Each structure stands twice: as structure tokens, then as C-alpha cells.
């Protein structure tokens, strides 16, 4: 009886581990480096559905209004890829590190994506000669 219970619990734990790996991102963070103020930048994160069921993004939220995630509402079939486009508006000078939380219907824990960089003052433009 103890052996049966142990194997049952072990099987459940293993299945939760597999569930957490159903969606795999090619990268979890991206560094823009130095970017000019007031010039929005975008990075596209790619993921693969390794699960048996279609992966559906329930929501993607950024920690502030300066960062915007965009994604497809369509299910991603087994073995297929999809993307999440993250745009940062670069309005405030200085370093930044922003997180985007992605929740998939087929995965228990949300995925956290991070973008980082430094916003520097825009270079002055040369005035046209008159």
C-alpha cells in the first residue's frame, strides 16, 4: 500500500513538472542597451508549445504603462511557435528593468519576461540652414 501511494504521489509530482515545461521561451530577457529618449523600442519573444494540448495565453500584463505586450489570442498548436511583442516607450531618462507577466491556460505558473536598458537624451538635430 505504501509503495502504491508513493508511486502515485511521484507520478503526480512528475506530471506537474511536465506541465510547467509545456511552453518554452527561446529567451526570458532582453537587453536593449542604450536607447534614445522618446524613441520606443520593441523586442519579440518567441515561444514553442511542447505540450499535448493547444497553448492559449490567458493574459499578458506589464508592470507599468510604459511597457506594452502584444500577442495573438489564437491557440498555439503542439510543436508550433508564436510570439509576444513587447514595446517600451522610452519616455523617462535612466536605466530600466521592466517585467511582463504571461499566463498560459495550460501552465500553472506564469512566465515572467524582462526587458532592460538605459534611456539616454536624444542627440540634438542639426537645424536646417536658411
Regions found by a protein language model. Name each.
Residues 30, 43, 80-86:
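Short strand-edge motifs at loop-to-beta-strand transitions and within beta-strands
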Amino acid at each position: 500500500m505504501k509503495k502504491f501511494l508513493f508511486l502515485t504521489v511521484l507520478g503526480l509530482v512528475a506530471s506537474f513538472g511536465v506541465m510547467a515545461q509545456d511552453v518554452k521561451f527561446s529567451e526570458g530577457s532582453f537587453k536593449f542597451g542604450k536607447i534614445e529618449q522618446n524613441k520606443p523600442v520593441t523586442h519579440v519573444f518567441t515561444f514553442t508549445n511542447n505540450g499535448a494540448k493547444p497553448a492559449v495565453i490567458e493574459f499578458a500584463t506589464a508592470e507599468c504603462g510604459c511597457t506594452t505586450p502584444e500577442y495573438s489570442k489564437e491557440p498555439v498548436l503542439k510543436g508550433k511557435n508564436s510570439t509576444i511583442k513587447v514595446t517600451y516607450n522610452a519616455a523617462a531618462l535612466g536605466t530600466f528593468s521592466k517585467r511582463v507577466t504571461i499566463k498560459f491556460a495550460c501552465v500553472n505558473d506564469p512566465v515572467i519576461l524582462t526587458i532592460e536598458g538605459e534611456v539616454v537624451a536624444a542627440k540634438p538635430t542639426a537645424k536646417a540652414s536658411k
